[in-house]
Amino acid sequence: MRTGKSDISGWLVRPAGGHLWAVLVTVLAASAAHAARLTPDGGMDNAIVVRAARTWLDGGSPYDDPHFLYLPSAVLAAVPQALLPGAVLRVLVPCAVTVLLALAWACALLLHRVPLGSRLAALGLTGLALGFAPFGHLVRLGNWTVTATVALPLALLLASRGRWTGAGAVIGAAVALKPLLAPVVLLFLFAGRWRALAAAVLVPALASAAAALAMPDPAGFFTRTLPFLLHGDDGFVRLYEASPAAVLPRLGVPAALAQGLAVAAACAGVLCAYRRWRRADPGPLRLAETGAGLMLSAFLVSRPSYDHYLLVALPLLLAGLPYAGSVARGVWFWIALVPQAPGLTWPWLEGERRRAFRDAFTLCVLAVTVARQGWTAPAGAGERVPQGRAPEPERAPAAPF
């Protein structure tokens, strides 16, 4: 990759001026302050988890609330918040979510060997905060999806440095808080990293089993939450889901057919992610695109599937912008993001309950765009990995910029 003035990658990785950082800090501070003013309890979604923890402290079952969709270990993790007054949570939660989103972006940059002081570091996060509506939604909701947005790039960063068991432990810890990153265990399976796979499975299993023993309803997750997730019976929640299985029936497609199409698309996405992994090309794109592909495939079929779930995969893809052949260099990546521009009004899709159609467009186009990476090898891509345990990703001596 050239670093001359005519090449955008060279410009992006040069140091950012102080004015860019000032703009970024102002934007993030304004986003957090706006959320603190609007949400008296630290965000609607965070309040569900905190309420579950308070119910448990009072001797009740957290799973009495059908909207509590977390493992028992999340109840104990929310206890510190349950002990804080609402006035503190009102400020603390949006600030914490904003910091975690910035940390997720930093991990994605480090994975791609992009300097943290670069123009891409400043402009990328500013663009996400200003130009990607789910960023603001996540800050206002305080949803624990933010733990997954940090854990995935952090785990892939560890894996890129050969610390696979640590990567598995990070994924396991994130699943213990919210089981959103469960599909990433397939990456460890693809790579033949059995210790990492064991860590990713055992950490949430042991944490949840220990926490369940302290619950009045130890099997509540399996008897109440899991059936709710499998059947998606909440009509109100369904209006905000972005998966094809939820959106297509609203367009008149039979529910069974919609579910079948979503499952088929998810399976195809996993196959493409596997093919992407089998390409032994050096550099970080292999890890980033495989991980993002697995998560986007899961979002096609998962219930629920909300717009802010996209933030789990998007930073990984955007941080690869300096690399030729990356997803972010393709036009369809940017087309997918157009419906998420704040303030852009779409005819017949103005209402909040209809934004799921825009979210579904973004999800599906991103999923297809990433999946294509598994079938269209760029020029200079390495040979396929032989059968058996996958080797360490080949380390380039330096970033190509």
Identify the meaning behind each predicted range.
Residues 165-179, 183-188, 293-300:
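Membrane-interface alpha helices of multi-pass inner-membrane proteins
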